[in-house]
């Protein structure tokens, strides 16, 4: 089993959430872990990295023929279900703040330290003819500030395949979460291999 630490260097505001609203304040809140801190689920990371590898495979790169074997696949016939799917050989943990920062934030006497990790941003639609905001078009989003998040990646594969997966993630995963077309979620992915 090969292991590495995936470092997500969030370059700007980002939002990973389920679309749940926050009452009158915002329409979409970000997801938080059990400590109330922003995070990126491992399932999302797996999907982003699989997509990066699939793009290289579909472009004709023979080094990426492993995608179904490593990430898992469903039966190609029409009656797809969990019993006919093939399990993958790769695992991603949730991407979270560093243990040191998590410890500091848990010691904080006031909630403002955690609150400083998020912001609310707003947008509205503008009427082209009048140049004013359309009625009922104001939307609010909770976003997380730029930060580094850490996830574990483990794979039951050879080193060449593992290196190809890391290369695809580092080169092709450019954004994480929602509202990417509006500039949110820009990320740089790096890896810290174990000695």
Predicted regions located by residue number:
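RNA-binding basic/glycine-rich loop and surface signature characteristic of RAMP-family CRISPR effectors
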Residues: 1-118, 122, 134-195
């Amino acid at each position: 089993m090969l292991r590495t630490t995936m470092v997500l260097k969030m370059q700007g505001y980002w939002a990973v959430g389920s679309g749940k609203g926050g009452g009158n304040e915002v329409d979409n809140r970000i997801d938080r872990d059990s400590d109330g801190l922003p995070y990126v689920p491992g399932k999302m990371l797996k999907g982003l990295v699989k997509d990066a590898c699939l793009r290289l495979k579909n472009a004709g790169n023979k080094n990426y023929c492993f995608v179904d074997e490593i990430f898992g696949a469903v039966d190609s016939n029409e009656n797809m279900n969990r019993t006919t799917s093939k399990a993958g050989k790769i695992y991603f943990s949730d991407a979270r703040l560093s243990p040191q920062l998590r410890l500091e934030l848990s010691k904080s006497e006031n909630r403002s330290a955690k609150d400083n990790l998020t912001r609310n941003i707003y947008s509205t639609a503008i009427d082209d003819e009048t140049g004013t905001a359309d009625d009922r078009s104001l939307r609010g989003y909770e976003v997380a500030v730029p930060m580094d998040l850490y996830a574990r990646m483990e794979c039951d594969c050879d080193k060449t395949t593992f290196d190809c997966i890391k290369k695809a993630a580092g080169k092709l995963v450019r954004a994480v979460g929602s509202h990417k077309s509006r500039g949110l979620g820009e990320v740089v992915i790096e890896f810290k291999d174990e000695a």
